[in-house]
Design a protein with these regions (language model features):
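Binuclear metal-dependent phosphoesterase catalytic core
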Residues: 2-3, 12, 145-153, 251-259, ...
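Divalent metal-coordination and catalytic microenvironments
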Residues: 29, 49, 61, 66, ...
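Active-site-proximal beta-strand elements of phosphoester/diester hydrolases
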Residues: 21-34, 156-166, 206, 283-289
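Extended active-site neighborhood of metal-dependent phosphoesterases/phosphodiesterases
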Residues: 2-16, 82-199, 292, 305-311
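Metal-dependent catalytic neighborhoods of phosphoester/phosphodiester hydrolases
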Residues: 37-41, 65-90, 107-128, 217, ...
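N-terminal active-site segment of His-dependent metallophosphoesterases
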Residues: 1-82, 87
């Protein structure tokens, strides 16, 4: 394994071994229900997580939201989201890998037993989980930075974990929320503090709900425009759906382009999309999902199921590779 976690100047960092890529495995949309009705699907999802982690040979696992699915009204999960969260965390802890999460829109639905603050306390108490609740004065729970350092102590890449929030009001029908202005300012301040000699620090961002510019870039790519570059994966949601916020204008992507720090964004949310492409200098990637529960009939589909590998090199460059569950032994 490459990379060791340390505390330096009061914050957690990862120190990368020279000459070896630091590998992150992105998992997303596990959707553990935790109810009697979802027992078999939960078993399949947790077995898939275990198989993918064992095959990935990753130094760190980043889970980009919707670990659980407390949807009792649809008989797709118990409102006791602590139970389902424990089911997922116990598998990760048993594997002994360093891991972390950001929240999706489903982890703490309005009828769920625990809110994000309480779930955050649980995650941060796990031995191998590196989740941080972040500054309580900033919107959301789980806005935090883990710097990836080179052996000489210089910054390689800032790993930025962001709560992309859930809904505009208390329920799904109000539409998806955006990353808020104060979260964007927090990101900028973190990067400014990590930057040296006028060179903007490189960063990768991990969050759940995609920005609208992901679809904008895909449409340009689909039309053969040189403004966007296709790398791998597919858009398989019905009618080429991208689940970005439709009723509120998000500023995150545009501000990241201006900042010049963020080289990659890794998301989930749309379970059938696995697209990875570059638009306006930022690699936009839908992680392969796990879900056997939330989408009707998804247990019988498999082309979208798996993990996503991110290999970061000494100079801060990185590669992205899809790891389908079907390729895992």
């Amino acid at each position: 394994m490459n990379g060791r976690f340390e505390k330096r100047d009061g914050r957690e960092v990862i120190v990368k071994e020279k000459g070896k890529p630091f590998r992150i495995l992105q998992l997303t949309d596990i959707h553990i229900g935790g109810s009697l009705g979802t027992r078999k699907k939960d078993e399949l999802a947790l077995a898939a997580v275990e198989k993918i982690v064992k095959n990935a040979n990753a130094d760190f696992v980043a889970v980009t939201g919707d670990m659980v699915y407390p949807m009792p009204l649809l008989n797709q999960g118990t409102r006791n989201n602590l139970k389902s969260t424990k089911m997922f965390a116990s598998v990760m802890e048993k594997l002994g890998v360093d891991w972390t999460v950001v929240f999706g829109n489903h982890d703490s639905e309005v009828w769920a037993k625990l809110n994000k603050e309480q779930l955050g306390d649980f995650y941060s108490a796990q031995q191998h989980c590196h989740f941080q609740k972040g500054d309580p004065d900033i919107f959301g729970v789980g806005n935090y930075c883990i710097p990836l350092l080179n052996e000489d102590g210089s910054l390689n890449t800032a790993l930025m974990f962001i709560d992309s929030n859930a809904y505009l009001t208390w329920n799904f029908f109000s539409g998806f929320d955006v990353i808020h202005d104060d979260q964007i300012e927090w990101y900028k301040k973190e990067i400014k503090a990590l930057s040296n000699d006028g060179e903007v620090a490189k960063s990768l961002a991990f969050f759940h709900i995609p920005p609208k510019e992901f679809k904008e870039g895909w449409e340009k790519c689909y039309r053969g425009s040189s403004e966007a570059t296709y790398h791998c994966g597919f858009v398989q949601e019905k009618d080429n759906y991208f689940g970005y916020p439709k009723t509120k204008e998000g500023k995150f992507f545009g501000e990241m382009v201006k900042l010049g720090s963020c080289k990659g964004m890794f998301m989930g949310h749309d379970h059938l999309n696995t697209l990875s492409m570059t638009y306006k200098g930022i690699r936009l990637t839908y992680g392969m999902s796990i879900d056997y529960n939330a989408y009707k009939g998804i247990a019988k589909r498999n082309t979208q199921r798996g993990g996503t590998l991110i290999d970061i090199y000494d100079d801060g460059s990185f590669d992205v590779t899809l790891l389908p569950l079907s390729d895992c032994k």
